[in-house]
């Protein structure tokens, strides 16, 4: 393989060989050299032996002129090759010769363009000239030097280029004598070249380092020529070191940008524009650094480690996220630094910053996802820890504070692990969001817990007050409301004390705490008021129950039997008085221990003013009930208005009137059932009309004995048959019942008499006593049976539901 890799850089028509240059750089591995490379070019008249010199000096294989075929143009355009065996890497450019007949005298454009290109690209420019031209006014090298100096004015280069004049076919004149003459000629040419105003007085030494070497004739003294070339070759080793031939490196572009830089320079030169090398260097650095940055960005996106990390973050927090991502980012930035290290520092740094910003912009959503996972995890941990702390019985505020501090501390630690070295991202907003979420959860839990506590103590108050208040109102009397007030005060204090102790762990402000306790007290009061309103709605039923209880039961709570001895008027008055007492108790709410005259007003208006003969005073009192409010009672405390009381009392009297009437009827019926004597007129008639029969009995006492025996038998049958009891159920049922019992009873009685008659005479007295005792016993049994049988007749049913 050709080690020099000779390649045409620019053809004779001025076309830049892009693919050829890329192939050349790849073959000679120029892009790996960084800034450690040098470019040497050679100028000179056509057929002056430039290619021959380069081939011997640098080991290249440029095409040389065949002298046997005549002198003609050999090199067309610009060729490039690598020097063999010289370090650092040295690239040689062989330029088309000047003053060639092929282009003619007027076609000097390519000469100037190639000269300008060589000066812009090269560190060292060899100017090949004949020894016999030194000192001549019309020498062949003067147009070349004028061209070099003229184009130099268009470069604006910050560095000095080494111009090495190679004197060919040296004569016997010593070099020490030739060099001053050559330098003088060079200075004259420099002075004659038009310059910009800024460089009118600028010496040649500010632009060029001038070196002069002489070589013997290759054709006449080949061995001496080769020896001199070998010695010259040694000067190109380490040429880029300080003090070397190419020691000024200020305008050098990195080797990996050489092809792009050369192409852009040639394009500017062809467009006949001034070539500002510093600006060109910046441009090259900008383009190449941009390309490198884009490559590294694409490489980062395709990085397997980054993809795995990004995918892992989607499912949850990743341990060591910041460290892993920082390592991947640093690797990409380090690769950029390695490839862009030789470019303009300001451009390199700027593009590096842009690359870093793009990379950070790419990874920031993933970083935010990590923060989101950390925040969600911290919030969930807080909720669990907070719930466990509350279940363990710890104070609400202390639990909330300790759990919040612990979870936020863990979140901060997670953020520290997630933050990457290359970015100074602020996690405070996420932290603030977490704090707000925690505070919102604490607030919601506090609200729920306070609601639970309130509900708990309200339910306790419901249980403690509802039943007892209902029972107290059911037995309404003068002590009802004092007992209710006492109950309300006791249960309210217990509930407030319990709630106050429960609230101590919440660290509430005093105003809120006092309001909650006051609300609980009001709730307890509301329970009593609500229950009182419910009972007031059932006032009529309660009054009728009270009336029925007192009217139908005696002082021993035994059912009352209307035997005819009871004072129904007094009992009715007592029962209605008790019902009126109940109405007065239920008329208003008395939780503030305030005095009122409701009972007195109702008594005067409703109880004492009965009948149609009411006095004018009573009428005035009744009129006082024609109002919707009670005197000295707030409307909100009124349960039953005076007008409603009047209406209720009227309805009450109407519905209880039937019960009283039933009692009176039962009493009258009982009296009739217990009175067996005929009316007085019947007794008088019996005396008048039965006088003769009575006298007959007196005249014949035997009839008295018969009547007495008949009386005893009748009495025994009366008792045995329970005639009065049977007829209490009705005449027809009584007759049917007696008809079935009569014969067995008579037979039983006769049997007993027969047994008495068969008794021994000695026991006559005993028999008489036994008979009397049996009669008494029979009477007692009959009486008892009569009593039990007559009981239903005496107990007249009372309709209390009316």
From Swiss-Prot:
It is an enzyme of class 3 (hydrolase). One of its GO terms (cellular component) is Golgi membrane. Residues 757-802 are annotated as: Disordered. Changing residue 185 to N: In rhd3-2/fra4; reduced root and root hair length. Strong reduction in the cell wall thickness of fibers and vessels. GTP binds at residues 44-51. Residues 699-701 are lumenal. The keyword Ribosomal protein does not apply. Disulfide bonds: none annotated. InterPro entries: G_GB1_RHD3_dom, P-loop_NTPase, RHD3/Sey1, Sey1/RHD3-like_3HB. Keywords: Coiled coil, Endoplasmic reticulum, ER-Golgi transport, Golgi apparatus, GTP-binding, Hydrolase, Membrane, Nucleotide-binding, Transmembrane, Transmembrane helix, Transport. It is a multi-pass membrane protein. The keyword Ligase does not apply. The chain crosses the membrane at residues 678-698, 702-722. CDD domains: GBP. It is found in: Endoplasmic reticulum membrane; Golgi apparatus membrane. Belongs to the TRAFAC class dynamin-like GTPase superfamily. GB1/RHD3 GTPase family. RHD3 subfamily. Probable GTP-binding protein involved in cell wall expansion. Required for appropriate root and root hair cells enlargement. May inhibit vacuole enlargement during root hair cell expansion. Plays a role in cell wall biosynthesis and actin organization. Seems to act independently from auxin and ethylene pathways. May regulate membrane traffic from the Golgi apparatus towards the endoplasmic reticulum (ER). HAMAP family: Sey1. This is Protein ROOT HAIR DEFECTIVE 3. It comes from Arabidopsis thaliana.
């Amino acid at each position: 393989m050709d080690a020099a890799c000779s390649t045409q850089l620019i053809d004779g028509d001025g076309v830049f060989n892009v693919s050829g240059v890329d192939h050349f750089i790849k073959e000679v591995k120029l892009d790996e050299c960084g800034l450690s490379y040098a470019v040497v070019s050679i100028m000179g008249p056509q057929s002056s032996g430039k290619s021959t010199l380069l081939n011997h000096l640098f080991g290249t294989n440029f095409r040389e002129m065949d002298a046997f075929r005549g002198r003609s143009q050999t090199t067309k355009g610009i060729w490039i090759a690598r020097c063999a065996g010289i370090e650092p890497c040295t690239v040689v450019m062989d330029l088309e010769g000047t003053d060639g007949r092929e282009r003619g005298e007027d076609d000097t454009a390519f000469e100037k363009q190639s000269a300008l290109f060589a000066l812009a690209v090269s560190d060292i420019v060899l100017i090949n000239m004949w020894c016999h031209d030194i000192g001549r006014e019309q020498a062949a090298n003067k147009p070349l030097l004028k061209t070099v100096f003229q184009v130099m004015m268009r470069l604006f280069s910050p560095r000095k280029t080494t111009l090495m004049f190679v004197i060919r076919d040296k004569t016997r004149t010593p070099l020490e004598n030739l060099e001053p003459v050559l330098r003088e000629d060079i200075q004259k040419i420099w002075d004659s070249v038009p310059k910009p105003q800024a460089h009118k007085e600028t010496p040649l030494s500010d632009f060029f380092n001038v070196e002069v070497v002489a070589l013997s004739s290759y054709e006449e003294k080949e061995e001496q020529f080769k020896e001199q070339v070998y010695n010259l070759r040694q000067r190109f080793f380490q040429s880029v070191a300080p003090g070397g031939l190419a020691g000024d490196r200020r305008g050098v572009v990195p080797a990996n940008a050489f092809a792009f830089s050369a192409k852009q320079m040639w394009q500017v030169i062809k467009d006949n524009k001034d070539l500002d090398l510093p600006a060109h260097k910046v441009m090259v650095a900008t383009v190449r650094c941009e390309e490198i940055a884009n490559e590294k960005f694409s490489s980062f996106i395709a990085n397997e480690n980054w993809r795995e990390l990004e995918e892992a973050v989607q499912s949850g927090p990743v341990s060591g996220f910041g460290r892993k991502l920082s390592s991947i980012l640093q690797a990409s930035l380090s690769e950029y630094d390695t490839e862009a290290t030789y470019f303009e520092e300001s451009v390199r740094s700027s593009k590096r910053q842009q690359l870093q910003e793009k990379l950070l912009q790419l990874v920031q959503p993933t970083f935010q996802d990590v923060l989101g996972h950390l925040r969600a995890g911290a919030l969930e941990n807080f909720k669990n820890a907070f719930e466990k702390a509350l279940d363990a019985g710890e104070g609400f505020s202390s639990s909330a504070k300790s759990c919040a501090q612990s979870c936020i501390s863990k979140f901060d630690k997670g953020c520290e692990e997630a933050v990457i070295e290359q970015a100074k991202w602020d996690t405070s907003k996420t932290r603030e969001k977490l704090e707000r979420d925690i505070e919102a959860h604490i607030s919601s839990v506090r609200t729920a817990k306070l609601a639970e506590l309130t509900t708990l103590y309200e339910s306790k108050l419901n249980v403690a007050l509802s039943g007892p208040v209902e029972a107290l109102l059911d037995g309404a009397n003068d002590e009802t409301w004092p007992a209710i007030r006492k109950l309300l005060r006791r249960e309210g204090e217990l509930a407030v004390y319990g709630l106050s102790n429960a609230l101590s762990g919440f660290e509430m402000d005093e105003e809120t705490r006092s309001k909650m306790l006051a609300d609980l007290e009001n709730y307890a009061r509301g329970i009593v008021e609500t229950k009182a309103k419910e009972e007031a709605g059932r006032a009529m039923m309660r009054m009728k129950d009270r009336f029925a209880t007192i009217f139908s039961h005696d002082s021993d709570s035994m059912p009352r039997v209307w035997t005819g001895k009871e004072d129904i008027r007094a009992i009715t008055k007592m029962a209605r008085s008790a019902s009126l007492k109940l109405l007065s108790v239920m008329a208003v709410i008395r939780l503030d221990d305030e005095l009122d005259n409701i009972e007195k007003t109702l008594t005067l208006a409703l109880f004492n003013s009965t009948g149609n003969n009411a006095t004018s005073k009573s009428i005035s009192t009744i009129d006082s009930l024609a109002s919707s409010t009670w005197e000295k009672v707030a409307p909100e405390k009124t349960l039953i208005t005076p007008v409603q009381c009047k209406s209720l009392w009227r309805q009450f009297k109407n519905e209880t009137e039937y019960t009283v009437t039933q009692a009176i009827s039962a009493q009258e019926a009982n009296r009739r059932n217990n009175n067996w004597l005929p009316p007085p007129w019947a007794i008088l008639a019996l005396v008048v009309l039965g006088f003769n029969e009575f006298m007959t009995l007196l005249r014949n006492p035997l009839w008295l004995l018969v009547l007495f025996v008949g009386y005893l038998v009748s009495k025994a049958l009366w008792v045995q048959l329970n005639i009065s009891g049977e007829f209490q159920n009705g005449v027809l049922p009584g007759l049917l019942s007696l008809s079935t019992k009569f014969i067995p009873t008579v037979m039983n009685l006769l049997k007993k008499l027969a047994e008495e008659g068969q008794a021994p005479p000695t026991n006559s007295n005993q028999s008489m006593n036994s008979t009397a005792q049996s009669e008494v016993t029979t009477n007692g049994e009959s009486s008892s049976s009569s009593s039990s049988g007559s009981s239903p007749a005496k107990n007249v049913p009372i309709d209390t539901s009316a």
